[in-house]
From Swiss-Prot:
Keywords: Amino-acid biosynthesis, Histidine biosynthesis, Hydrolase, Methionine biosynthesis, Multifunctional enzyme, NADP, One-carbon metabolism, Oxidoreductase, Purine biosynthesis
Subunit structure: Homodimer.
The protein's name: Bifunctional protein FolD
Listed GO biological process terms: L-histidine biosynthetic process; methionine biosynthetic process; purine nucleotide biosynthetic process; tetrahydrofolate interconversion
Family: Belongs to the tetrahydrofolate dehydrogenase/cyclohydrolase family.
NCBIfam families for the chain: PRK10792.1 (NF008058)
Key word Ribosomal protein present: no
Catalytic reaction annotation: (6R)-5,10-methylene-5,6,7,8-tetrahydrofolate + NADP(+) = (6R)-5,10-methenyltetrahydrofolate + NADPH; (6R)-5,10-methenyltetrahydrofolate + H2O = (6R)-10-formyltetrahydrofolate + H(+)
Gene Ontology terms, MF aspect: methenyltetrahydrofolate cyclohydrolase activity; methylenetetrahydrofolate dehydrogenase (NADP+) activity
EC number: 1.5.1.5, 3.5.4.9
Binding site for NADP(+): G166, A167, S168, I232
Pathway(s) this gene product operates in, as recorded in its UniProt entry: One-carbon metabolism; tetrahydrofolate interconversion
Pfam family name, one: THF_DHG_CYH_C
Organism: Shewanella baltica (strain OS195)
Gene: folD
Amino acid sequence: MTAQIIDGKAIAQSIRTKLSEKVTARKEAGQRIPGLAVVLVGADPASQVYVGSKRKACEEVGFISRSYDLETSCSEDELLSLIDSLNEDPTIDGILVQLPLPAHIEDSKVIERIRPDKDVDGFHPYNVGRLAQRIPVLRSCTPMGIMTLIKSTGVDTYGLDAVVVGASNIVGRPMTLELLLAGCTTTTCHRFTKNLEQKIRIADLVVVAVGKPGFIPGEWIKPGAIVIDVGINRLDNGTLVGDVQYDVAAQNASFITPVPGGVGPMTIASLLENTLYAAEQYHD
């Protein structure tokens, strides 16, 4: 068996095209154009790349994109003050603060300062809580994008044994909640997990988000499983690879996401979907 590739790049482009059409329809109806504020603190190269991609995608679908680039030395109070002003700005539907933040700024304080109706990253405890209670509104972007990828396979998720490897607030934990909502029997694995191999080998669906190249050997993948690889790791030779040993896993899986071109584009597409949702549901 050779796995079918889940083409995140193509699916994300399809979403962006639909969003662009909706923005055009809003303009023609005399409605306001959705606005996203993107805040970057410091000059971390990876963060600059991510932020650049988000701003470019915004412009592509016709959203208003406002950029706020702050110095690394920016105080926590300065950042919170900016968020307060964006919370009250009627032209802004979504506020995104690029993580990680410098050590002197507390991530959780910043996340909780963003109004839940403008939390298009889906990180606010209110929005995570809504997902936990099976009434999601603004959902965490990467897990939301992954669910779109899984749905694209046409596989019925109800009753699947799913394993999530990684328990971060950004991916692993909300991913577990998304899979529960989709009817999966879900196991979340982390650094204290025993018998990881045993759990992976019986999984119908595996989502891996640990940031370690080739962390999951391909031979662990159950024949016919769906493999979602969230990792994006650059090797010393410059090659980008995921957290799963791709070549071997692709021989066992029924569907697999490539790295790059799998999950990454979907995170940004989901961010754009959330921004339009916030405009339509909360701010029109």
